[in-house]
Amino acid sequence: MLGEVPSSDLKPTKDGFIFIDPTKFAADVATDLPPAQAEYMSNSQMPVAAAAFDAPATVAAWRDKPSYGIVATADHALNPMLARWMYKRSGAEITEIKANHLVYISQPGAVASVIETAARSVGGNATKAQ
């Protein structure tokens, strides 16, 4: 969870997993969802293996495959400036959507449109032109 400074809202479990502090969930990732939905998602979140954040990538698919990225401009979990930088670095086609971290839930039509554009652009060929 990145913002101006790293968030302390990620809580570790004794067995190596992390989850978002339920009292901070809505403010961190779900400000644009109805409160009842944010509360439900907070209560039903599944912990993630902390090791997943340290696992090295062995292949950078963006080097030879078309890449598309969505910057959630109101994201409180992943700083939008960092998201833009990563997407630009990879040569991704960037779409900005005014939404928080759970953009695929709060703005499903906009996200689907980006996916459809990406699918049409490769036309069955998912390799970048050389």
What are these regions (language model features)?
Residues 1-22, 27, 49, 78, ...:
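Flexible "cap/lid" loop of the alpha/beta hydrolase fold
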Residues 66-75:
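Conserved strand-to-loop "acid loop" that flanks and positions the catalytic carboxylate
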Residues 26-31, 72:
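Second-shell loop/turn segments in exported
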Residues 40-61:
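Active-site nucleophile elbow and catalytic-triad environment of alpha/beta-hydrolase enzymes
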Residues 62-67, 89-92:
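Short, proline-enriched alpha-helix->beta-strand connector loops that line the catalytic pocket
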Residues 80-93:
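Active-site-adjacent alpha-helix of alpha/beta-hydrolase-fold enzymes
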